[in-house]
């Protein structure tokens, strides 16, 4: 509200323009100073007189007592006796006089409340209470403010004292290679050596063999890099407990290729002790445990992709610099060039007749890599058009090589007549649009080429034979093992610009070998330092004939990290992923050859970075670095969550921020070379990549583009910090006001009691999250079915953590549904969770159970949020939330969720899955509480900020209606002054009709002038006492707390006790709304009961920001109009929040809102003032004012100056909000309405509605409304984005190769258990049926929440199903009822049958292999073998066909068995249901007969 406008009430306002009011204000303004001094003098004289009187009375009484005591002592001495009688003790006096007073009060109260008597006495007492304010209010219940435990802000200092330091350091260093069992670790320890180095001694030098892992036990080692000019540059400093090793050199040593240091040197800075572990020790271990070797290779490849590539590509902008771009020649050690294919196949096809052409082709390709093989002139025109679409190289560092792929394609692809072989089904897909790719800048120049005769026909069998031979060499297999890969090799012919595989696709992962032509490898422009990502792909490198690609994705088991396209006409040979894994079972060593192929392709830069980059694993509570330590490195969070805590000089700790997956930690301190300003610790188990400062300097010198990336990153970070200036300096700032990122990757769901419907709740939340992005729901059953029943054992720690990390990487958020007991899965969920949602029933008891306390003990540092569920009934509203929060001081935030009827329906687990299989196919309701919770978890919340402006705040109601019609959800609400009132109404009701009705009634009460006159008081602090104003707000809200509102709400007030603004997110609603409306001069500040601080209108500092009405009243405490409101918590005086921030959008942004709509209805000051010079005369102003013939001047008067001074902070905050990118600032045209024009409520509301409707329609046409009402994707998400768990399974190569116990997938029969026969909720988590993919398909429909009609439809469907089943039972024989024990026995027999079926299947496969080998031997003896493989195509086809038929028969038998079991279980369940229905009907009939008899 505006003080100046209140002092300038126009004559048009009929309620305040009376003569009596004007005379009263004029008299008070002139006489207030004299009256104040007079009363002060009278008060001082009165105090002096009273003090003098009391002093002399006290002195006289003391003299009298002294005389009496002296007389008694004289008498006692004379008589020699004791004259003391019975003593009247003080306690007895208090009891005596207390009883007398109570008897009198009882008589008085009896007279007052007797019928028709004591009326005058009651009136006098009521008048006295009103004047003297003797009324006593019961203070409301408030949230107990409990400091978080010490573990929440402190690191864990517990050390591993039982482990020797050298063993501990070694264990931590080799952890990068994966998990080792204890016997293997002890065998590795036997090979360790201790090296003692003095300062300046070399640990290793250039040309030394790179065959060891070095671990620093004490001292410091400096690792240098040597440049070409002979200069050296420090790469990193290795301290105690750290290691020096290279993962790429480790693969070289295992592959048998000796590696030497070429540019890296290590020297001791001081006296040091280093542990040396030879890599040959691993070879000895791997001979006995091949599964360990394969697992180590897989871990190294995963670390290479997640650490090296993530750091260098996403944060330093290096893409093509990571791969060597060279062409392999004929003399290469692995594979052969295209000339070899030409000469070999030509000789085999035509013998000596075509030797001349073959030799010419061979000499043409071997002589120069840039010379094309001659081709017929007729084909030039054909290829010239295709070559125009060949992609150019956007990176000038990569040579644009013109290869002979097209001519070789002519030799292989075009036979007599020019027909191409297209007999194979296409694996690839042609791109529909190549608009994101740049076309070639220049055409190919046609050179003079000699004519060549006709090319002879080529047999595709020989082409495949050549491909098999080349792939065999690439995989490191001997010649006699060619038959192993022959059945799996496929050959395809590619047109130009054909996509073989796309980035992020896990379905078509293959090992590609280029026979002719060229493949181009691209990667998306994923720059972590940019806000808007480019959709263009970056060219990484070319794959030339004789080279292989795809080994990295094959070894990691993850999706492809690149997009591969054909650059021109090409022929490729490939082996699919499943085939590679089958080959690995027979020849595990191909894992090393694939890994070696990946390593050979990397550039020297990657090898140098491999020495500097470190992979760090931090357990929960461990510190990454501490405050005031030196900053020599930065860190990238790969997985987990980190918390930054600052320690103030007084010892108090405060949260500065939290970091999630993909965040960069400590970059500013490292670049500015300052010490660490905070302590960063792990909230949960986390993986990080460490980038030392020396590596940054080395890369900056070689690639200046890195500097640009760092500047861009720092600029965006500083810009974001400026726009999200924190408000933690205020005493009332909540924990959420800290700049903590409210975006979580993993969420654990924990039920408070067994009757909580956790599975339906998880499904509903999963349904809403699917509209935002890819999400995954994990349960204990699903983990066991995917990874085995023993997956939670300690020996399977690596498999479980790797699988969970893979799922988290592929989804924006992962839901961990915990068990109802403290099981290993529940403990794992606590270790993996970024936030824990504690789910309870709002209408049940708030007591804390033992299980919940154990959860708090397991996750001390993890943020916990309370979710209370309420049924969808007309009378259900949140209540008693304070009791829930006080019983759980560890909860940082709470959510009220209104649930549809289907969540509380008591159904079996099978029926719940069946119900949500249909629900998940529909669109979620974006206005539901589940969608609001989903947006909060993913950091996409939408906030609404309502500013102050007096009666102009009626426009907020119209804007709310327009927002609702525009389809914009509201997740958070904040308000100041009148905005606090309107926002609180919306959060309480969420119905625009009810909100409008209550706001209109309150506005009518504000127009009753006689009530305002009765509220006038002597204007020492304010003009009004605020009693009637408090009454109107209290009647509007009642005794409601802010915690009981449906939508998260806050109001902002001005604390004049602490001289700052305060944010209120809990407490009495009406009081803080009242204090936010306490405009200075009109209403006294509200005294905060918490600390006694005086609170004024929050608009004085920020005009856009317990029992509910108290804080609403505090937010409306206009200074001078109403007295400041005293906070019932601390006693601070609160005034209107408009003095500090009239539109607190910045506060809303700090509380977690990503998109904000700010509505400002405040008055605008006139800035067009008159320049009157250096001095100003009041007489001159008076002359200008009264002279009608002079030009008017605009000079602010005293009240105007005071008002402008009060709103200085508010105006500054408002300008920052207008210029921010996260806020949509809206100001309706309501300037013509005065601050106190409450009688024009409907008119102002209509103005706001019409303006808001037109405004949002304009935003929709401009395409700017999507970020508010279209938070889910318009297009159906692709299969890769919403893939099911079966599509993204963790590939454990060790399990595949070494034939470890296999796990079972999701079978339909596994979804049926004995729990289905029970009534009520089955809290044990489970999964959907087999077709999980269709539940993640985009929804089709309008709403998630089912209406009554939809619920009836569901019930009708269920009734139809029941009738169909009854009809089936009527025609068929009803199976007998089965007990639970029988079901358990049948389940056990099913498992045995499945085991027997698998044994038979393996026996059939072994028999087929034996028959195949016998057939091969027979064919070899007859001399009818083809090529070097000893294998006929017909035999291969026959063998494969027999295997396929056997598999189909097995699958049919298995499916038939499962269908029978499912029918039996369903039949038993239906029979039980029928029996229960019959019993229920019999009981009801018996009751009716009894009633009739009575």
From Swiss-Prot:
CDD domains: CAP_ED (cd00038), Pat_PNPLA6_PNPLA7 (cd07225). GO terms for molecular function: lysophospholipase activity. It is a single-pass type I membrane protein. GO terms for cellular component: endoplasmic reticulum membrane. Residues 435-449, 1370-1381, 1484-1494 have a biased composition (Polar residues). The active site is at 977 (nucleophile), 1097 (proton acceptor). The modification Phosphoserine is found at residue 443. Its main location: endoplasmic reticulum. It comes from the Eukaryota. Residues 57-1494 are cytoplasmic. Residues 944-1110 form the PNPLA domain. Residues 362-372 have a biased composition (Low complexity). InterPro entries: Acyl_Trfase/lysoPLipase, cNMP-bd_dom, cNMP-bd_dom_sf, LysoPLipase_patatin_CS, NTE, NTE1_P-loop_dom, PNPLA_dom, RmlC-like_jellyroll. One of its GO terms (biological process) is membrane organization. This is Neuropathy target esterase sws. The gene is sws.
């Amino acid at each position: 509200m505006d003080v100046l406008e209140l002092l300038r009430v126009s004559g048009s306002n009929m309620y305040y323009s009376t003569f009596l009011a004007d005379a009263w204000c004029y008299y008070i303004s002139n006489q207030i100073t004299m009256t104040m001094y007079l009363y002060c003098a009278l008060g001082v004289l009165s105090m002096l007189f009273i003090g003098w009187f009391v002093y002399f009375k006290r002195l006289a009484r003391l003299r009298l007592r002294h005389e009496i005591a002296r007389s008694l002592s004289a008498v006692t001495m004379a008589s020699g006796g004791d004259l003391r009688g019975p003593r009247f003790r003080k306690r007895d006096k208090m009891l005596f006089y207390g009883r007398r007073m109570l008897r009198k009060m009882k008589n008085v109260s009896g007279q007052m409340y007797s019928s028709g008597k004591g009326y005058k006495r009651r009136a006098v007492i009521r008048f006295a209470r009103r004047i003297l304010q003797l009324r006593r209010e019961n203070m409301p219940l408030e949230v107990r403010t409990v400091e978080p435990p010490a573990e929440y802000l402190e690191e864990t200092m517990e050390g591993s004292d039982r482990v020797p330091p050298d063993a501990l350091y070694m264990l931590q260093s080799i952890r990068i290679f994966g998990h080792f069992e204890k016997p293997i670790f002890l065998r590795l320890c036997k090979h360790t050596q201790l090296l003692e180095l003095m300062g300046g001694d070399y640990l290793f030098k250039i040309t030394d063999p790179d065959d060891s892992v070095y671990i620093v036990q004490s001292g410091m080692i400096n690792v240098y890099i040597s440049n070409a000019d002979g200069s050296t540059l420090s790469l990193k400093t290795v301290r105690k407990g750290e290691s020096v090793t290279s993962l790429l050199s480790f693969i070289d040593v295992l592959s048998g290729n000796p590696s030497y240091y070429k540019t890296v040197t290590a020297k001791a800075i001081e006296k040091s002790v280093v542990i040396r572990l030879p890599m040959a020790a691993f070879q000895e271990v791997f001979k006995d445990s091949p599964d360990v070797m394969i697992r180590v290779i897989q871990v190294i490849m995963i670390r290479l992709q997640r650490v090296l590539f993530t750091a260098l590509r996403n944060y330093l902008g290096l893409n093509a610099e990571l791969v060597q771009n060279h062409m392999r020649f004929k003399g290469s050690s692995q594979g052969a060039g295209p000339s070899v294919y030409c000469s070999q196949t030509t000789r085999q096809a035509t013998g000596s007749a075509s030797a001349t052409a073959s030799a010419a082709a061979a000499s043409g390709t071997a002589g120069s890599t840039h010379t094309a093989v001659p081709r017929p002139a007729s084909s030039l025109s054909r290829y010239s058009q295709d070559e125009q679409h060949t992609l150019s190289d956007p990176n000038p560092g990569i040579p644009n090589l013109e290869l002979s792929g097209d001519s070789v394609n002519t030799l292989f692809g075009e036979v007599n007549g020019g027909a191409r072989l297209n007999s194979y089904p296409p694996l690839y897909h042609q791109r529909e649009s190549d608009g994101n790719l740049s076309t070639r800048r220049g055409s190919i120049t046609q050179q003079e080429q000699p004519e060549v005769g006709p090319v002879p026909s080529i047999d595709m069998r020989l082409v495949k034979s050549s491909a098999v031979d080349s792939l065999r060499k690439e995989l490191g297999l001997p010649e006699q093992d060619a038959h192993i890969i022959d059945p799996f090799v496929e050959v395809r012919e590619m047109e130009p610009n054909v996509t073989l595989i796309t980035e992020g696709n896990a379905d078509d992962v293959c090992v590609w070998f280029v026979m002719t032509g060229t493949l181009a490898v691209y990667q998306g422009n994923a720059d972590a330092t940019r806000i808007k990502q480019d959709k263009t792909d970056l060219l990484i490198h070319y794959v030339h004939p004789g080279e292989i690609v795809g080994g990295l994705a094959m070894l990691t088991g993850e999706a492809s990290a690149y997009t591969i396209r054909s650059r021109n006409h090409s022929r490729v040979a490939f082996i699919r992923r499943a085939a590679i894994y089958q080959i690995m079972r027979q020849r595990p060593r191909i894992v090393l050859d694939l890994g070696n192929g990946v390593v050979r392709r990397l550039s020297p830069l990657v090898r140098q970075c491999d020495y500097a980059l470190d992979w760090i694993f931090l357990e929960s509570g461990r510190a990454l670095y501490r405050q005031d330590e030196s900053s020599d490195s930065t860190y990238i969070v790969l997985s987990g969550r980190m918390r930054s805590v600052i320690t103030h000089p007084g010892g108090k700790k405060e949260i500065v921020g939290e970091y999630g997956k993909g965040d960069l930690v400590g970059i500013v301190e490292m670049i500015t070379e300052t010490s660490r300003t905070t302590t960063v610790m792990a909230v949960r188990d986390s993986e990080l990549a460490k980038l030392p400062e020396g590596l940054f300097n080395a890369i900056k010198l070689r690639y200046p583009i890195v500097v640009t990336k760092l500047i861009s990153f720092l600029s965006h970070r500083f810009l974001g910090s400026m726009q999200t200036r924190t408000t933690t300096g205020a005493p009332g700032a909540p924990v959420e006001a800290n700049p903590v990122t409210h975006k979580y990757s993993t969420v654990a769901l924990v039920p408070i009691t067994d009757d909580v419907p956790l599975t339906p709740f998880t499904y509903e939340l999963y349904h809403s999250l699917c509209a935002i992005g890819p999400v995954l729901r994990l349960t204990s059953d699903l983990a066991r079915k995917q990874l085995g029943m023993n997956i939670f054992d300690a020996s399977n720690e690596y498999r479980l953590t790797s699988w969970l990390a893979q799922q988290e990487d592929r989804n924006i958020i992962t839901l961990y549904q915990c068990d109802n007991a403290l099981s290993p899965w529940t403990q794992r969920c606590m270790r993996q969770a970024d936030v824990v949602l504690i789910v309870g029933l709002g209408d049940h008891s708030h007591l804390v159970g033992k299980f919940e306390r154990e959860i708090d003990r397991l996750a001390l540092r993890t943020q916990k949020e309370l979710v209370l569920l309420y049924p969808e009934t007309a009378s259900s509203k949140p209540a008693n939330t304070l009791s829930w929060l006080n019983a759980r001081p560890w909860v940082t935030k709470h959510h009220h969720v209104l649930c549809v009827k289907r969540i509380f329906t008591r159904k079996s687990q099978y029926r719940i899955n069946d119900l949500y299989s249909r629900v998940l196919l529909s669109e979620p309701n974006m206005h539901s509480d589940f969608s609001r919770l989903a947006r909060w978890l993913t950091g996409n919340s939408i906030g609404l900020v309502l500013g102050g402006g007096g009666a102009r705040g009626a426009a907020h109601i119209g804007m709310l209606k327009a927002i609702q019609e525009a389809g914009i959800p509201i997740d958070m609400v904040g308000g100041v002054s009148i905005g606090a009132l309107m926002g609180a109404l919306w959060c309480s009701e969420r119905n625009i009709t009810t909100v409008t009705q209550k706001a209109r009634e309150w506005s009518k009460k504000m127009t009753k002038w006689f009530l305002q006159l009765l509220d006038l008081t002597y204007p020492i602090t304010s003009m009004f006492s605020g009693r009637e104003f408090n009454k109107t707000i209290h009647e509007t809200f009642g005794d409601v707390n802010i915690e009981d509102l449906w939508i998260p709400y806050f109001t902002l007030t001005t604390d004049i006790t602490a001289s700052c603004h305060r944010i209120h997110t809990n407490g009495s609603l009406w009081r803080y709304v009242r204090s936010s409306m306490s405009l200075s001069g009109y209403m006294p500040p509200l005294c905060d009961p918490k600390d006694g601080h005086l609170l004024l209108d929050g608009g004085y500092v920020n005009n856009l920001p317990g029992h509910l009405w108290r804080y609403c009243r505090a937010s409306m405490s206009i200074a001078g109009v109403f007295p400041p409101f005293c906070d019932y918590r601390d006693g601070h005086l609160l005034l209107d929040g408009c003095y500090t921030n009239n539109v607190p959008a910045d506060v809303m942004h700090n509380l977690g809102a990503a998109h904000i709509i700010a509505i400002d209805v405040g008055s605008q000051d006139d800035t067009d003032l008159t320049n009157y010079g250096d001095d100003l005369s009041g007489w001159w102003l008076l002359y200008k004012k009264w002279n009608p013939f002079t030009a008017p001047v605009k000079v602010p008067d005293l009240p105007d100056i005071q008002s402008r001074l009060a709103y200085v902070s508010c105006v500054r905050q408002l300008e920052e909000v207008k210029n921010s990118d996260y806020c949509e600032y809206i100001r309706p045209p309501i300037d013509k309405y005065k601050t106190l024009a409450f009688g024009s409520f409907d008119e102002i509301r209509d103005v706001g509605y019409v303006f808001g409707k037109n405004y949002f329609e304009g935003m929709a046409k401009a395409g700017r409304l999507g970020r508010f009402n279209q938070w889910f994707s318009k297009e159906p998400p692709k299969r890769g984005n919403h893939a099911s768990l079966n599509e993204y399974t963790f590939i454990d190569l060790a399990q595949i190769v070494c034939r470890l116990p296999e796990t079972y997938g999701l079978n339909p029969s596994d979804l049926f258990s004995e729990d289905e026969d029970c009534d009520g909720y089955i809290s044990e988590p489970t999964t959907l049926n087999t077709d999980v993919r269709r539940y993640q398909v985009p929804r089709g429909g309008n709403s998630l929440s089912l209406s009554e009609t939809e619920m009836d439809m569901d019930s009708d469907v269920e009734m139809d199903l029941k009738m169909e089943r009854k009809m089936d039972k009527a025609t068929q024989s009803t199976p007998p009822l089965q007990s639970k024990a029988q079901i358990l026995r049948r389940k056990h027999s099913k498992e045995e049958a499945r085991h027997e079926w698998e044994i038979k299947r393996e026996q059939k496969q072994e028999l087929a292999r034996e028959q195949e080998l016998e057939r091969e031997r027979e064919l070899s003896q007859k001399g009818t073998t083809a090529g070097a493989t000893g294998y006929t195509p017909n035999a291969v086809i026959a063998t494969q066909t027999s295997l396929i038929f056997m598999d189909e028969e097995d699958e049919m038998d298995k499916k038939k068995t499962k269908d029978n079991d499912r029918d039996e279980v369903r039949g038993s369940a239906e029979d039980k249901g029928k029996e229960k229905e019959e019993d229920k009907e019999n009981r009801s009939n018996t009751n009716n007969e009894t009633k009739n008899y009575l």
